[in-house]
Amino acid sequence: MAKRSLASLNAGDLSGKRVLVRVDFNVPLNDAGAITDDTRIRAALPTINDLIGKGAKVILSAHFGRPKGQVNDAMRLTPVAARLSELLGKPVAKTDSCIGPDAEAKVGAMADGDVVLLENVRFFAEEEKNEAGFAEKLAGLAEVYVNDAFGAAHRAHASTEGVTKFLKPAVAGFLMEKELQYLQGAVDEPKRPLAAIVGGSKVSSKIGVLEALIDKCDKVLIGGGMIFTFYKARGLSVGKSLVEEDKLELAKELEAKAKAKGVELLLPTDVVLADNFAPDANSQVADVTAIPDGWMGLDIGPDAVKVFQAALADCQTVIWNGPMGVFEFEKFATGTNAIATTLAELSAKGCCTIIGGGDSVAAVEKAGLAEKMSHISTGGGASLELLEGKVLPGVAALNDAA
C-alpha cells in the first residue's frame, strides 16, 4: 500500500504548524569532529525546504552514532546544525536535549519557517526501546509528523514509529517517498529483464536478500568474497580465500533454487588473486578452477567482467548491492569500478539502475559515477530488508495514501 506523502499537504495544512521531521543525519566525522561527507544532510534538503516554503515550523529529529542511551559530547549534533545552516542559508537552532525545558523553549520561540534541530535522540535509552512515554514527549513538541529517514526505517524506535501514535497526519518525506518508489518498484513491478548484482565478503549477511532476489530476478550475478563459499561448495580449491564453512550447504541450495526457477545465477569465471591481504600484495589472475594454494581472491577477473557485462547488456532494471572485491585497495578495485562504469552506461540507455546502499554506494562515489545512476539508496540495512520483502516499521507506521 502506498504511503501518504508530504506532497499531499499544502501551505493551508502546514502554515504555522509545528512539524516533527525525522531525518537521517548519521554522517561521518574525522578526528577533528568535522563532517567528511554531507550527502545525508543534502538528501533531506528538498523536504526541509518544502516545509519552510509552506510556512511550517520545522523541528528536526535525528540520531548520531551509538551513544547507548547516554549523553556523549563527541556525538552531539553541533557540526550537523552548522552544516545544515550553511546549506539552507539561514540559522538552525540546536537544543541541548531532544525533550525537556530547553527543547520546549526553543520550539516555543519559533516563527513560521524557522528550523530547530533537536539534540541526538539516542542520548535517551527510551528511543531504541520505543518507550511510549518518551515518544509522547517527543511528539508533544509538534502537530504533524514527517519521516524522511529511510536509513532508520527498519528500526521500530520512538522517533520512527512510536511518535506516529500521537501525531496525525504522519507522512513520508520526499527522500523516503523516492526510496520506496525505486526500491519497492524494482521488486514489485520492475521493467524486465531484472538483474541483481550481489557482492560483499559474506554469504551470511546476504542470505535473505539472495533468497528473495532469486525469487524475483531474471538474473543474479554474485561477486565479492562470498563467491569462494560457492566455489568450495562445488568442490573447487580456493587457496587462502575467505570461506564460510558453515554456509556450504546453503550455497548449494541457492544454486539449486536458481536452477529450479530458471534464474540465471552467474559466478565469476576468473579472479584476481593476492599472496596476502594488503594494498601492495603480489597479484595474479587465475581461472576459478585453478586457484593455487597460499593465494586468496580479492577481486573478480577480467574475463568475469566481460561475462557480467554481457549478461547485463539487455537488462531494463539492475539492483546492485555490495562490491565485487576489496575496492579499498586500488589494485583490487578493477572489477568493482568496471561494474560501476557498466551501470552508468546502461543508465544512459534507459535502464533503471539502483545502488542499494552500503559499500556499493561508496564504490560508485569513489568512481565518480554517482550522478549517472537512476537511484542511490541512503539506507544500508533498510535497503536490504526492503529488497527481502520485509515490512519496515518506520514505513508501516505512516498513514496510507488516500
Swiss-Prot record:
- Which molecular function GO terms apply here? ADP binding; ATP binding; phosphoglycerate kinase activity
Q: What are the leading ranks of the lineage?
A: Bacteria, Bacillati, Cyanobacteriota, Cyanophyceae, Synechococcales
Question: Is the Cytoplasm keyword given for this protein?
Answer: yes
Q: In which pathway does it act?
A: Carbohydrate degradation; glycolysis; pyruvate from D-glyceraldehyde 3-phosphate: step 2/5
Similarity comment: Belongs to the phosphoglycerate kinase family.
In the UniProt record, what gene is named as encoding this protein?
pgk
Q: What is this protein called?
A: Phosphoglycerate kinase
Recorded GO cellular component terms are:
cytosol
Q: Where in the cell is it found?
A: Cytoplasm
InterPro entries from the UniProt entry: Phosphoglycerate_kinase, Phosphoglycerate_kinase_CS, Phosphoglycerate_kinase_N, Phosphoglycerate_kinase_sf
Q: How does the annotation summarize its subunit structure? A: Monomer.
